[in-house]
Amino acid sequence: MKKTHRGVSFGTVFMLAVTIVVTGLSASILPRLLGTADLHMDTAALSALTLDGAIPALTLSDIPINNAMSEPSATPEPSDSATQAPTPVPTPTPFPGGTVTLTLGGSINIDDAVRKSAYYSESKKYDFTEILALLEDELSADLTMLSLENITSDAHQVSALNAPPVVFDMLAQSGVDIVALGYPKAVDKGLDGLRTTVAEAQERGLVTLGTYNSETDAATLRLFTIDGVKVAFLHFAESVTAAGKKAISGERAEYALATTHISGSEAAMLADIREARAVADVVVVSLNWGKVSAAKPTTAQQTLAQQIADAGADVIVGAGTRVVQPVTWLTSKDSSGNIRQTLCAWNLGSLLNESRKDGNVLGMLLQLQVFFDGKSISFEKACYTPTYIWRYKQDGQYQYRIVPSDQPAPDGMGDDQIGYMQKAYKNIQKYLGDSPVTLREK
């Protein structure tokens, strides 16, 4: 593009004028500064610097003066936004729910031989604490529950029914939190025997289920909060002996033993489960039921278990048969029509008893990891530890220890006992069959 010719700008003219003035002043001042120096400037040449009249005459009015020294503007007032406090960062909303681990075991039976093994003649005292010592890691969980099929009353002579109260020391020191006391013979020594048993357990910090010292105690839901997850435990006995019925009716203390089939108690049981469902995130229902040594549940048990699942149970565990029975899923719908899954372990067997029959020397610990997302639960882990009742002689007296049968034999176990333990392990795998639980990983 052709550029347009532009004239001499005003700025250029101004600068040339200043240069001429400075040059003239220098001509008059320098001789004085230099003394004898002879300085001569041709005025004709100086006039030539005017570019032959190209520079017009200038006056001050012709020179624009920028207002560079104008008064500063007033300091701006701070705006409202500058004085406002910073917006606080909102506190993160806590994540609803969490994870809880449960270990649920079968029954403890302090039979005569077991009781005698824990008696020390020198001190004339009982000490059961070593019996579960080899199982402490497996019993560890946020909440651990076992069943006891004995009463503990100092007012009565010790027997296969009445165990020394220090049996609760064994449970408490092994990490057990909850003990289910309801079973058919729980009131065979009257309500005093039942109340003493409950009191002995509670004095050692154990939470009791199934038998109660008062109506208030019976009406109090056993509710625990672990990692933000509310877990409810309930326990019921399938039946009660004639002696127990007489003791209960004599004092009109129907609250003392929670049952499933006595005088309309089934409806009361289901109502209790529904109430627990309304306030808990996880509901565990424990039952003492079934026929001794039966390999599978009866039709009546299956019907009752489905009713319990429909009422809101998430986990059902049984004890009382002294043998392990399968584990299965039960399907039901909640009040909103959503499909629910209930894990049902028909029977966990006996953790401790004196019998040496193949089915009675083994048991299992059901170990669960349950996650609650704020709305519903899921079973992150459903596994088991198989147990074996190791009996051996020491100083002419039998001793009992409960050991995990899938692990290496403990020190001191003879070859014959190792063989029995391995057999027990194979049997429990057979009993569980296609059950949805897996062997616990160490």
Question: What do these predicted regions represent?
Answer:
Residues 2, 10-20, 24-71, 76-442:
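Acidic, metal/ion-coordinating pockets
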